[in-house]
């Protein structure tokens, strides 16, 4: 159970970081 929770936590963190980087690159391109 702990492993599954840690896996989802890591997946959520990776998704958040990817979204932030993607939005950042998009804003730089718009500018």
Curated annotation (Swiss-Prot):
This is Cytochrome b6-f complex subunit 6. It is a single-pass membrane protein. Pfam families: PetL (PF05115). The chain crosses the membrane at residues 4-24. Belongs to the PetL family. Keywords: Chloroplast, Electron transport, Membrane, Photosynthesis, Plastid, Thylakoid, Transmembrane, Transmembrane helix, Transport. GO terms for molecular function: electron transporter, transferring electrons within cytochrome b6/f complex of photosystem II activity. Component of the cytochrome b6-f complex, which mediates electron transfer between photosystem II (PSII) and photosystem I (PSI), cyclic electron flow around PSI, and state transitions. PetL is important for photoautotrophic growth as well as for electron transfer efficiency and stability of the cytochrome b6-f complex. It is found in: Plastid, Chloroplast thylakoid membrane. InterPro entries: Cyt_b6/f_cplx_su6. GO terms for cellular component: chloroplast thylakoid membrane; cytochrome b6f complex. PANTHER family: CYTOCHROME B6-F COMPLEX SUBUNIT 6 (PTHR37266:SF1). It comes from the Eukaryota. The 4 large subunits of the cytochrome b6-f complex are cytochrome b6, subunit IV (17 kDa polypeptide, PetD), cytochrome f and the Rieske protein, while the 4 small subunits are PetG, PetL, PetM and PetN. The complex functions as a dimer. GO terms for biological process: photosynthesis.
């Amino acid at each position: 159970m702990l492993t599954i929770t840690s896996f989802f936590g890591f997946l959520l963190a990776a998704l958040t970081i990817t979204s932030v980087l993607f939005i950042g690159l998009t804003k730089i391109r718009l500018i």
